[in-house]
Amino acid sequence: MFYNNIPNSPTEDFRVVDVAMASSAAPVFFPTYERNIDGGIIATDPSLASIVYSIDKTLGKSIENIRLLSFGTGYYYNSIKQDTSNWGAIDWVVSKDPDLPIISVTLEGNAQVSQIFSKKLLQDNYYRLNPRMNRDISMDDVKAIDYLTQLAKEYDMTECVSWINDKWNKI
């Protein structure tokens, strides 16, 4: 289920706390919430889904009216360095570089496709804010909080602020 507050949506009146609990119920890390799990399992980067909902014909909106500022959680380019040509099903699960490569490839590929298609659809009306990290950080690594805080403080927001000023102030 994609939660949104679009008029007449079945989720229009859902409470924010319920949406937050459901959308953060990442399998393995957190329990399901009212039979829902983290939407990142289906749409790691929900940009494309948000565009599709925004151009719903019942809303009478045009794609030209959409401005999308997409916030990432930071990325670390981590490719599979091994030769995978002889891998079987087990190798895609148990290999350690990266951990669980089939999941890593699936989630990262899903996010990249969403970003590529979103940019293709919206062109300059799409901006992705997603700082590059110099190391891989697992979702539950509390020891990385200081590093992430420092990364956020040092991140150059000039281009993003310029995009916001250019795109939002013209609407």
Predicted regions and their residues:
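Conserved catalytic cores and adjacent C-terminal regulatory segments
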Residues: 1-171
